[in-house]
Amino acid sequence: NAIRFLDRVPTDRRNLIQLGFKHPHYNLDCPDRFYQMYDPAAIRWPTIASPEDYFGPQPGFAVYEAAYIANGRWTPEKSGDEAWRQVVRAYFAAISHVDHEIGRFLRALEASPIAETTTVIFLSDNGFNLGNHDSFHKMSQWDSAAHVPLAIWHAGMEPAEVAMPVSLHNVPKTVMQLAGLPPRPDWTSGQSLLPLIDPAFGRYDDSLSPVTSVFGTLSVRPSAEGYRNL
């Protein structure tokens, strides 16, 4: 338990806590009070892309459904409005449950002896299209699927916000630079994100763009402004 570890954490050496949550992956089971935060009747369908922005059924998505969603036999948007609302409600509830647990950990960290010497990196592996663009999957670079939380807190670092799309491949080299260590020579992917926060850390190469390649599909999210399909 991460909170119990903070009660006995050694302060004379480096420590690493990797705190992961399955939610909001299926199954979307959490304490009832989090479901009660959301009224299914108040949930509205997201804006569907205009015809010229919707690229239609893709073979890769069919493979994804077959592998992950009941062999392709069921997805919420195929089962009617009420089924979709209940799934989205459960998805939101699962996120709120994670928010609650993260808050518990951060409060415990703030009260611990390592609060001022600890770096916190908060991220998610992917978002999800909950009907956005007439889809119910994650295999795309649309904002609903690719725009995930990525936050870095480090004692003494001035707050800054970065709008540029970046890749999670950058996180390992960011951690190493924060620790004052060189990246491993076999890490050929990614770059440290710290120059985006403070130029004193060096230069960030913004000519590189996040890419997703899975199930025979390829999506590119250019870092340059002006190339964005929301």
Features from the language model and the residues they span:
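Active-site-proximal cap/lid insertion segments
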Residues: 1, 5-117, 121-165, 178-187
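C-terminal cap/loop subdomain of S1 sulfatases and analogous C-terminal strand-loop tails that border
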Residues: 126-132, 172, 177-230
